[in-house]
């Protein structure tokens, strides 16, 4: 039996029919265009982390900025104004790793730039690797750039550049084609044998033609090398998304008065950002790149002479306290080296001795806490929130205004609990300009990048994308 065909010609002969058809076609065209826009991933992601950038300073010097740096980011970008790290204390290494992995040191195991190795009882650098000298092997989870490599069967190109070794390596991830930093001795760019030598030829050529830069122009040196990395490695030239991690610095030196130097740092950083962002867009195309700009949440506070202003202060001696604790535990449980070591604000107990003597770990921790809390300068004592293979059993929180001092190493350690405000800014194609004051945490950056380039979030990341 033949099916009857629908004859729409009579409908098209009417003005109302033609109107409905035109409206229907326009709707289909709009839906198709929107679908295309939503599905196109940027060809290049540039993740810029600025060490010690602060919102209060950023806003204070706003009248001095040019149009294409911070002003453009704040006017054209999607700006999250209230950002913090979901753990404390924070330093450059733990911050950059959190941004890359979308999780905390509890999972990624990068708790700081340096920790005490319980097996050797010696300080260990966060990117130390006995085989390659330095590498990202200490990161215990995948990073967003690692997942990009996995998703593209290794075809995506991934690079990290920074002034410092740890920032370059940690931001680039395990599977990167290269991580590069400035050698403190030679002022030339260098890398690790961990990375494939084929991807390092461009930096050797770059070193050959570029003079060693001044210390106060390090941000410009990093941005210039990053632009050369894009050109020489053809980043963002095809439909496979590439990834470039760049670490800049808003850290203050000691060359002039703090207020004057702070102004100089932010004005200089503004110019560097403006030039770098424009340079990337010229090379890749404005519609083909997504920028992510954030900060480490860390800050160097100048030493304050509280005594001069009659503000309560003092010094807590970690070495003396560790000796006192060992004497106390020896009196309770018998003579022995119950305290193995101490580092920064942490005390390491002798796990083997505790186990051999069949002593309850929770009991010895409780007794230790009770003693330490009676010590002047101690506000609280906590157990380690992380793996005790790389952290102490007891974490001492000093009384506000007090510093922790180790007489053996002649080093002072102080953690300020003051909130350091900083933003997260997304800039690029299909990103709507908006200021959002809802508080967020930095572990949401990685899944947002992952969603934007249509890949999985890092394997320990449980945070939701921001958009």
Question: What is each stretch, according to the model?
Answer:
Residues 80-100, 160-169, 247, 295-297, ...:
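Short, solvent-exposed turn/loop segments enriched in Gly/Ser/Thr/Pro and often Arg
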Residues 71, 141-150, 344-379, 429-430, ...:
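Non-catalytic, well-ordered alpha-helical segments in soluble enzyme domains
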Residues 104, 109-240, 248-254, 372-377:
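His/Asp/Glu-rich, glycine-adjacent segments
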Residues 58-107, 157-159:
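Short, structured active-site-proximal loop/turn typified by the sulfatase FGly-forming signature C/S-X-P-X-R
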Residues 65, 81-82, 91, 113-134, ...:
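Secreted, luminal/periplasmic, and some membrane-associated catalytic domains
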Residues 216-238, 251-289, 449:
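A long, amphipathic alpha-helix that forms part
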Residues 1-41:
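Bacterial Sec-dependent N-terminal signal peptides
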Residues 398-432:
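C-terminal, low-complexity/hydrophilic appendages and adjacent surface loops
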